[in-house]
């Protein structure tokens, strides 16, 4: 148990630690100039107890900083992190979660007894795994630097943490206002002087610990004014900050694509020490739709001897960081001794390493790596090969609440409602799902801001609980490195195979999860007990349906997954290939139009061949989604499911759109205008595909939150063919009966003829159907311009219906079926031209009641509206009976709104519209 110290005890500790304590007012607060790197420290600062930096060479800090905006990791995740860091020969963990309110927003508050016990346990676990635990605090939001009470409060807080067993600390002043309060302006000549003063004082008060980090407000090249080499702020830091204190730096930008050696030499010169890199290359807290599973890249191993350390600030989702941390470890170990490139002995460009790199990059979109010590593609394959083993290990949180990505904390008046403290893992946060991608007008201005944008990252639906089932490692005579090396060498011995193009068979999995109670929003697979395991398993008979057997995740699945969620500034090779193919198919779709003049058979064949290959690539994404959804390791699934769900949904739409392009009869020049260059907008690969669809601004249709319980169910949306007519009529009849309870047994086609027959016969170009493994279960029909469509109906469809259905006698009271028959013999009302100018397209859509996934309807509507807008439509409308509450609600959820009554509107229907 830890007790708070009294003010008297604190003052006594201060007097003991500081033989000559600095005054808290006047110029005496500004420290003397720090010696240049390599010079002796005349005051002896930093050499206390023989552990200061000046007392000898300090080890290279390499590991992880938990420094993102969003829900912090829980204690058991951090313990698992320590285990992995030790296994991969990394050595450092920096505790700096932005949304632990006692770390940043309410930094003055002391930790409670329960929180203290958890922190002590965590620090002890780090020591057990030989990981250096660095505790960071961020007082810069509201501290008054010249107030002695504020300084004492900060000391008291760090004193408490030091009593937990922590020996390494960091003061962070990132993402704060540069302006000082009036009281500080009277004492300090600049903001930098104020920060350096308190940092030096705290550093000396703590006994000049061996590891003490300082994060400046100008922590990257783009934040330095007027430049890195001429920044007065950095110059003050370099001259005044004591030499035993290390400086954190993110590189040229907040999220740096590359960190050149020259840039590090430039900043090292002005801050008079080698920096510690806070690397945001895998941080995803600035974009709710992105996940980064690509390798550590854009940092030459030549940097290692020029740095004091590298700490990666990775994805918010803990389990998604396997590749990020593993490849960082590979990068670090490739030049662990800090050997400069000019002394690395290589025989020629045909060395073994070079040959392996060339093999890995053959046929890819990436340039051949020039770093002879480290290949990102080799490192990625190493990481994925080892990660694959984790997917087959049953592992999940043992408590009821489970981490599930896909939501973010609520925001009121622009202020995030942050998760209260991370140390207490039972906090429940009110959440809403992620925002959809913005349209073309909302282009990202400037660079991603992993540290500056205080916006909640997409959060789990529920707080992860305290306990993780520990994975058991097999005790083998061989070391982990030996086993991994053998696996990778065996993989490398195989020839690089082209992408598998076999279409995946999609089957609905039998969910291993138990049914949820309605008042609980958790999603957890039940753990199998010994009693359950001992029960005799059911064995189906020869004529019974065989048991469902889930296919395991493959290395190819993980390679595809990494390519789809690669790095901030680039997509992986397969992802980039899919994007290019869709762009080409979209731009050249006119060659397969029925109305295309002067057809070129070779171009048509090329288009159809490339379209078929693109559909096969989409099928690979669906197969990957199915296998990931069925994997044994639910912990990994819960962290990544929303992202995989998102890419699966958009690829389903894109595939359907390509199929529509291949069978339509109209061409459209309008559709080919406005291509956007890749990498220009937010949202990752899914965002790129969304912006290539005609209705890219229909954010509500692309906003498809995943189900609370993960499912591997996949639906297919495809163009309608005449052979589908009976199935569409059946759905139309069953859903109409369900809505009003009026069977049409004597005239089974009547309701279909009335609602959808004309569209199916005269507007094939704009008709889609929904399929699952049992067949067609939905339809989405439309016509781009209702005026000529009505004329065609009067010429061909209506006469056919009049012949098929005899006009009933109007003298008697008519049944519902007879009223429909009579409508074929009556003159149809024509909608006003003023209305049709804005809503020229007619749509009809419905889905069978057995389909419970709400995202399916959005995808179907997106496909239908894309086809209409691609051919010039400005808006669409539908006609609904006023008493059909189900279908009214159905269309309303799809973004349709009721059009105000105007002269010429039919009296017995409600007209809903949607602008395009």
From Swiss-Prot:
Tissues and organs where the protein is expressed, per its UniProt entry: Detected in spleen (at protein level). Ubiquitous. Expressed at highest levels in the brain and spleen.
EC number: 3.2.1.169
Domain GH84: 60-336
Catalytic residues of the enzyme: 175
Record comment: activity regulation: Inhibited by Cu(2+), Hg(2+), Cd(2+) and Zn(2+) at 1 mM. Not inhibited by Co(2+), Mg(2+), Ca(2+), Mn(2+), Fe(3+) and EDTA. Also inhibited by sodium chloride at 1M and 2-amino-2-hydroxymethyl-1,3-propanediol (trishydroxymethylaminomethane) at 75 mM.
Catalysed reaction equations from the record: 3-O-(N-acetyl-beta-D-glucosaminyl)-L-seryl-[protein] + H2O = N-acetyl-D-glucosamine + L-seryl-[protein]; 3-O-(N-acetyl-beta-D-glucosaminyl)-L-threonyl-[protein] + H2O = L-threonyl-[protein] + N-acetyl-D-glucosamine
Entry's Gene Ontology molecular function annotations: [protein]-3-O-(N-acetyl-D-glucosaminyl)-L-serine/L-threonine O-N-acetyl-alpha-D-glucosaminase activity; beta-N-acetylglucosaminidase activity; histone acetyltransferase activity; identical protein binding
Temperature profile: Optimum temperature is 37 degrees Celsius. Less active at room temperature and shows very little activity at 4 degrees Celsius. Loses activity at 57 degrees Celsius within 5 minutes.
Cleavage, annotated site positions: 413-414
GO biological process: dATP metabolic process; glycoprotein metabolic process; N-acetylglucosamine metabolic process; negative regulation of cardiac muscle adaptation; negative regulation of protein glycosylation; positive regulation of apoptotic process; positive regulation of calcium ion transport; positive regulation of calcium ion transport into cytosol
Residues that bear Phosphoserine: 364
Residue span of region Disordered: 1-50, 440-480
Residues annotated for a protein binding in this entry: 67, 98, 174, 219, 278-280, 285, 313
Reported pH dependence: Optimum pH is 6.4. Activity decreases sharply at pH below 5.0.
The family this protein is said to belong to: Belongs to the glycosyl hydrolase 84 family.
Subunit note: Monomer. Interacts with CLOCK.
Protein name: Protein O-GlcNAcase
Organism: Rattus norvegicus
Organism classification: Eukaryota, Metazoa, Chordata, Craniata, Vertebrata
């Amino acid at each position: 148990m830890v007790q708070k110290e009294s003010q008297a005890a604190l003052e006594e500790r201060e007097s003991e630690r500081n033989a000559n304590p600095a005054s808290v007012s006047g110029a005496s607060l500004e420290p003397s100039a720090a010696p240049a790197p390599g010079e002796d420290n005349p005051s002896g600062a930093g050499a206390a107890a023989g552990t200061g930096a000046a007392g000898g060479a300090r080890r290279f800090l390499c590991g992880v900083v938990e420094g993102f905006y969003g829900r912090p990791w829980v204690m058991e995740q951090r313990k698992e992190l320590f285990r992995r860091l030790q296994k991969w020969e990394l050595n450092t963990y920096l505790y700096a979660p932005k949304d632990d309110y006692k770390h940043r927003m309410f930094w003055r508050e002391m930790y409670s007894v329960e929180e203290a016990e958890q922190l002590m346990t965590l620090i002890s676990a780090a020591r057990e795994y030989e990981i250096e635990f660095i505790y960071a605090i961020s007082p810069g939001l509201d501290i008054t630097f010249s107030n002695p009470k504020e300084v004492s409060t900060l000391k008291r807080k760090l004193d408490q943490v030091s009593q937990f067993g922590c020996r390494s600390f960091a003061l962070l002043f990132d993402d704060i206002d540069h302006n000082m309060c009036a009281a500080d302006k009277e004492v300090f000549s600049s903001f930098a002087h104020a920060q350096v003063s308190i940092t030096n004082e705290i550093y000396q008060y703590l006994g000049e610990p061996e590891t003490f980090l300082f994060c400046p407000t100008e922590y990257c090249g783009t934040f330095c004014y007027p430049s890195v080499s001429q920044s007065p702020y950095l110059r003050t830091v370099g001259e005044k900050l004591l030499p035993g204190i290390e400086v954190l730096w993110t590189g040229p930008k907040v999220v740096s694509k590359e960190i050149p050696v020259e840039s590090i030499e430039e900043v090292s010169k002005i801050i008079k020490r080698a920096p510690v890199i806070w690397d945001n290359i895998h941080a995803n807290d600035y974009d709710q739709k992105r996940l980064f599973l690509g390798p550590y890249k854009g940092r030459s191993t030549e940097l290692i001897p020029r740095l004091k350390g590298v700490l990666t600030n990775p994805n918010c989702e803990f389990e998604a960081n396997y590749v990020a941390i593993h490849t960082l470890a590979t990068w670090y170990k490739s030049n662990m001794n800090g050997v400069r490139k000019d002394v690395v002995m290589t025989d020629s460009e045909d060395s073994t390493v070079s040959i392996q790199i060339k093999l890995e990059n053959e046929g890819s979109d990436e340039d051949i790596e020039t770093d002879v010590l480290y290949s990102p593609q080799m490192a990625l394959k190493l990481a994925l090969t080892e990660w694959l083993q984790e997917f087959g290990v049953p592992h999940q949180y043992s408590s009821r609440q489970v981490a599930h990505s896909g939501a973010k904390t609520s925001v009121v008046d622009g202020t995030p409602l942050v998760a209260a403290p991370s140390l207490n893992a039972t906090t429940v946060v009110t959440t809403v799902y992620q925002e959809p991608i913005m349209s073309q007008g909302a282009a990202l201005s400037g660079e991603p801001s992993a540290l500056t944008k205080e916006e909640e990252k997409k959060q789990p639906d529920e707080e992860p609980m305290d306990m993780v089932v520990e994975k058991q490692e097999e005790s083998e005579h061989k070391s982990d490195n030996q086993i991994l090396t053998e696996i990778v060498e065996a993989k490398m011995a195989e020839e690089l195979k082209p992408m598998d193009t076999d279409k995946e068979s999609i089957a609905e999995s039998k969910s291993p999860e138990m049914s949820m109670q309605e008042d609980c929003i958790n999603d957890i697979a039940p753990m199998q007990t010994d009693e359950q395991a001992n029960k005799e398993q059911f064995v189906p008979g020869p004529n019974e349906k065989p048991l469902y057997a889930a296919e395991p995740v493959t290395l190819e699945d993980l390679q595809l997954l990494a390519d789809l969620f690669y790095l901030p500034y680039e997509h992986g090779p397969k992802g980039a290939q899919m994007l290019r193919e869709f762009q080409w198919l979209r731009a050249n779709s006119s060659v397969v139009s029925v109305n295309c003049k002067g057809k070129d058979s070779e171009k048509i064949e090329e288009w159809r061949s490339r379209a078929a290959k693109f559909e096969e690539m989409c099928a690979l994404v669906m197969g990957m989604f199915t296998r990931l959804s069925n994997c044994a390791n639910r912990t990994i699934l819960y962290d990544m499911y929303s992202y995989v769900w998102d890419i699966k949904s958009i690829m389903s739409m894109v595939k359907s759109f390509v199929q529509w392009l291949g069978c339509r009869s109209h061409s459209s020049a309008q559709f080919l205008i406005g291509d956007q260059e890749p990498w220009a907008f937010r949202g990752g690969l899914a965002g790129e595909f969304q912006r290539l669809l005609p209705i890219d601004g229909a954010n509500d249709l692309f906003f498809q939150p995943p189900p609370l319980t993960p499912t591997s169910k996949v639906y297919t949306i495809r163009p309608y063919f005449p052979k589908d007519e009976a199935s569409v009529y059946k759905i139309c009849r069953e859903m109409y009966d369900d809505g009003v309870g009026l069977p049409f047994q004597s005239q089974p086609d009547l309701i279909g003829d009335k609602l959808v027959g004309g569209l199916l016969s005269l507007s094939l170009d704009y008709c889609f159907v929904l399929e699952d493994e049992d067949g067609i279960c939905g339809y989405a029909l439309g016509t781009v311009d209702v005026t000529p469509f009505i004329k065609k109906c009067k010429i061909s469809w209506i006469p056919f219906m009049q012949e098929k259905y005899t006009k009933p006698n109007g003298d008697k009271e008519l049944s519902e079926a007879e009223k429909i028959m009579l409508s074929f013999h009556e003159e149809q009302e024509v909608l006003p031209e003023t209305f049709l100018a804005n809503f020229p397209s007619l749509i009809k859509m419905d889905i069978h009641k057995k389909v419970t996934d709400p995202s399916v309807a959005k995808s179907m509507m997106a496909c239908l509206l894309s086809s209409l807008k691609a051919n010039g439509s400005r808006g669409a409308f539908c006609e609904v009976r006023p008493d059909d509450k189900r279908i009214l609600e159905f269309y309303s959820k799809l973004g349709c709104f009721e059009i105000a009554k105007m002269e010429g509107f039919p009296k017995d229907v409600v007209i809903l519209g949607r602008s395009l």
